[in-house]
């Protein structure tokens, strides 16, 4: 299992507050922040999705795509900009995550610098697939390193199957488990065909 790793902000407070207000998954940890004030840091589609999802339960969601902004104009941004529970903070990067026992604030630098009081920070930066050796072996990947598979979970190399986060699909344990089961069945079928 190669999976993926997440890019981090690498700012003071990030490691200290992991699990105490710093999260890397809105789907996983969002329910803990019902009626709280949170920030979603990231400019990709997954970050936009988490802003949308968290706005349904959190009291306030600060969307902080970073100084570079969003990687593209995602369709969801149109109605999220009209959502009174969502506030976009552009032109700023998170410089520090702080608090005492739990996250209490982030410090921003850039055109919108200052301190923002909140209860949680969702760091939703791009995933970095850890399947580099497979790419070197000729397995087809996209520009981000995600492994391409067909509907049977087979890669471009006959008899080599991939499933889960390394394919960058779903990014949830339950999805990976289902894909793994499908890949295992396909692999068994392939082995039987060799007899």
Locations of regions flagged by a protein language model:
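A conserved FAD-binding loop/helix module that cradles the flavin
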Residues: 48-52, 166-195
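FAD-site-proximal beta/loop scaffold in flavoenzymes
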Residues: 5, 10, 15-32, 125-172, ...
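A Rossmann-like FAD-binding core segment of flavoenzymes
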Residues: 5, 56-148, 189-195
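Rossmann-like NAD(P)H-binding beta-loop-alpha module
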Residues: 34-57
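Cofactor-binding loop segments of dinucleotide-utilizing enzymes, especially the Rossmann-like FAD-
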Residues: 43, 66-68, 165
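Active-site acidic short loop of glycosyltransferases
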Residues: 35, 118-119, 157
């Amino acid at each position: 299992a190669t999976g993926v790793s997440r890019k981090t902000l690498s700012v003071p407070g990030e490691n200290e507050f992991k699990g105490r207000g710093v999260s890397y998954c809105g789907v996983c940890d969002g329910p803990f922040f019902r009626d709280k004030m949170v920030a979603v840091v990231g400019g990709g589609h997954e970050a936009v999705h988490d802003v949308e999802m968290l706005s349904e339960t959190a009291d306030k969601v600060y969307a902080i795509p970073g100084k570079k902004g969003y990687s593209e104009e995602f369709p969801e941004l149109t109605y999220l900009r009209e959502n009174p529970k969502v506030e976009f903070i552009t032109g700023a990067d998170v410089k520090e995550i702080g608090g005492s026992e739990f996250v209490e604030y982030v410090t921003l630098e850039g055109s919108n610098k200052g301190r923002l009081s909140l209860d949680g920070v969702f760091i939703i930066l791009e995933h970095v697939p850890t399947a580099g050796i497979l790419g070197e072996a000729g397995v087809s990947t996209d520009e981000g390193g995600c492994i391409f598979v067909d509907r049977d979970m087979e890669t471009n190399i006959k008899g080599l199957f991939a499933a889960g986060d390394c394919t960058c699909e779903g990014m949830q344990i339950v999805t990976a488990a289902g894909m793994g089961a499908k890949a295992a069945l396909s692999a068994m079928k392939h082995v039987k065909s060799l007899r």
